[in-house]
Amino acid sequence: MIKMAVKFVVVMIVFAQILAPIAEAAQGKAVYYDPPYTRSACYGTQRETLVVGVKNNLWQNGRACGRRYRVRCIGATYNFDRACTGRTVDVKVVDFCREPCNGDLNLSRDAFRVIANTDAGNIRVVYTPI
């Protein structure tokens, strides 16, 4: 009986670890901005290129600075064939996207290109904290 209980607990822990990232994933829209990626709200001048600015709901009065997200394109916001590349990109929050911000995530052009065709301009994404 104890052996079965231990197996059950182990199985539950494994499922929790597998499903936790899925539960934290959010969907939203992403746009991009062109370089130079300087004068960011978090770090001033910085050299990283896989970066993102976030909207107010993610910004949390600057507490978002330094957070990392894994972002995946799931489709174009507008009718645009083959917007997504099928890849993911890991980005670091370095900026605040002030209203009117056209996306939940304002990706650097370099980051956007990893996951989507820049001609799409505005895409639907899934993003997960990492």
UniProtKB/Swiss-Prot annotation:
Q: Which GO terms describe its molecular function?
A: peptide hormone receptor binding
Q: Taxonomically, which superkingdom?
A: Eukaryota
GO cellular component annotations, sorted alphabetically? apoplast
Gene this chain is encoded by: EGC2
The Gene Ontology biological process terms listed for this entry are:
alternative respiration; systemic acquired resistance
Q: What does this protein do?
A: Plays a systemic role in water and solute homeostasis.
User: What protein am I looking at?
Assistant: EG45-like domain containing protein 2
Q: Which InterPro entries match?
A: EGC1/2, Expansin/allergen_DPBB_dom, RlpA-like_DPBB, RlpA-like_sf
- Organism of origin: Arabidopsis thaliana
